[in-house]
From Swiss-Prot:
Post-translational modification as stated in the protein's UniProt record: Phosphorylated.
Taxonomic lineage of the native organism: Eukaryota, Viridiplantae, Streptophyta, Embryophyta, Tracheophyta
Keyword Nuclease: no
Name by which UniProt lists this protein: Large ribosomal subunit protein P2
Organism: Pseudotsuga menziesii (Douglas-fir)
Alphabetical UniProt keywords: Phosphoprotein, Ribonucleoprotein, Ribosomal protein
Gene Ontology CC annotation, any one: ribosome
Known function: Plays an important role in the elongation step of protein synthesis.
Similarity comment: family membership: Belongs to the eukaryotic ribosomal protein P1/P2 family.
Subunit structure: P1 and P2 exist as dimers at the large ribosomal subunit.
Length: 10
């Protein structure tokens, strides 16, 4: 899933 990737970029 990509949700973790965008969350890591916060």
């Amino acid at each position: 899933d990509i949700t973790e990737v965008i969350a890591a970029g916060r």
